């Protein structure tokens, strides 16, 4: 479903020219859970942004569902994301003027409200669905962000530190739900995490080492 071939990515910062990836190749399957680990600043979030078409690269190709991202326009990449992707981040980006339920409904386009209710319940936040984001805790916002990402049943789910703001109990609830979701819905879930135990629960773990992707 996602194919990376001979990818190189770099950027300039206050320290000079920094290489993030150099001649990297990897094939993600059509389904299953993939975790991405690495030291701080190694490129976990950059990799997520690259495969979802949110960031550019110098050399190589990334194909998503047989579409070459490097030749797609900004509008075409956006359309691809809307059709196939769901996103959940450590920092939630919920619409503050909408309730938790309405945030999910907006992402779902009002197609399947039953799926929204089911997801909120499994994530343990059905009791806050009518509250505004400003009225709930950081951990609840993070789970709401995941619920919103899943509300349209995406083929590809991209998650950046999905359990970063959660206590151990709620972290396990989210982990169990996501891994079961990947199995029962034949979806591809790719998540970056610094939680070693959570990373090891994935079907495959990718470690970013010295500008390369190494499957453990």
Write out the residue ranges for each language-model feature.
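Catalytic Walker B motif of ABC-type/P-loop ATPase nucleotide-binding domains
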Residues: 157-160
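A short, proline-enriched helix->beta-strand linker immediately N-terminal to the Walker B motif
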Residues: 151-155
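Conserved ABC ATPase "signature" region
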Residues: 68, 113-128
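Conserved ABC ATPase signature
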Residues: 132-142
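Helix-to-loop junction immediately C-terminal to a conserved catalytic motif
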Residues: 52
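Conserved ABC transporter NBD signature motif
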Residues: 60-68
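ABC ATPase NBD coupling module
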Residues: 69-86
């Amino acid at each position: 479903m996602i194919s990376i071939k001979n990818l190189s990515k770099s950027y300039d910062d206050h320290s000079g020219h920094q290489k993030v990836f150099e001649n990297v190749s990897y094939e993600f399957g059509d389904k299953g859970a993939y975790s991405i680990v690495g030291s701080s600043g190694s490129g976990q979030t950059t990799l997520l942004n690259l495969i979802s078409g949110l960031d550019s690269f110098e050399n190589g190709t990334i194909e998503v569902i047989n579409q070459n991202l490097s030749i797609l326009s900004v509008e075409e990449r956006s359309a691809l994301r809307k059709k196939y992707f769901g996103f959940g981040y450590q920092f939630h980006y919920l619409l503050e003027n909408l309730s938790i339920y309405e945030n999910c409904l907006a992402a779902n386009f009002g197609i399947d409200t039953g799926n929204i209710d089911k997801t909120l319940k499994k994530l343990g936040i059905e009791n806050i669905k009518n509250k505004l984001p400003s009225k709930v805790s950081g951990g609840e916002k993070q789970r709401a962000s995941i619920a919103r990402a899943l509300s349209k049943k995406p083929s590809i789910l991209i998650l950046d530190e999905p359990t970063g703001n959660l206590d151990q109990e709620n972290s396990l609830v989210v982990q169990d739900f996501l891994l079961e979701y990947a199995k029962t819905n034949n979806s591809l879930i790719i998540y970056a995490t610094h939680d070693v135990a959570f990373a090891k629960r994935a079907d495959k773990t990718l470690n970013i080492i010295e500008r390369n992707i190494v499957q453990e």
